[in-house]
């Protein structure tokens, strides 16, 4: 089981934990919490904090924080690499194997590259 948690959203999405979503489906808009005031100015800047976990079982606990039973932290970059998921295994890879290419969905709905299984959680403009 793979779980992703998004923070600093403009508003809470109308979905439940464990609910399936389609790749590239808009579930929320990024907000400015965590950057408003101080160094970033009165209005802050829109950004996303992405946390990921994986677990061999589907059970989880959710009160103030989300915790998968038997879960482990997951470097979100591993999702785009296609494995391994364990941080220690990623760290042990030779430098040449640590490169990650991100798949993304454009504002018009096109998946780049075609056939990708996971996309970056922001709509992007191709270069």
Describe these PLM feature segments.
Residues 2-24:
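Short histidine-centered loop motifs in beta-beta connectors
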Residues 3, 9, 36-41, 64-68:
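Short, flexible coil/linker segments at or flanking structured domains
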Residues 8-11, 34, 52-54:
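A mature extracytoplasmic/lumenal domain signature
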Residues 14, 35-37, 57-60:
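Conserved protein kinase catalytic core
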Residues 17-19, 25-29, 52-54:
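Internal, well-ordered interaction modules that form the hydrophobic cores of assembly/scaffold domains
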Residues 25-45:
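Flexible, gly/ser-rich surface segments that form the specificity/activation loops bordering the active-site cleft
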Residues 43-127:
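Acidic, glycine-rich catalytic/binding loops that coordinate metals and/or anionic ligands
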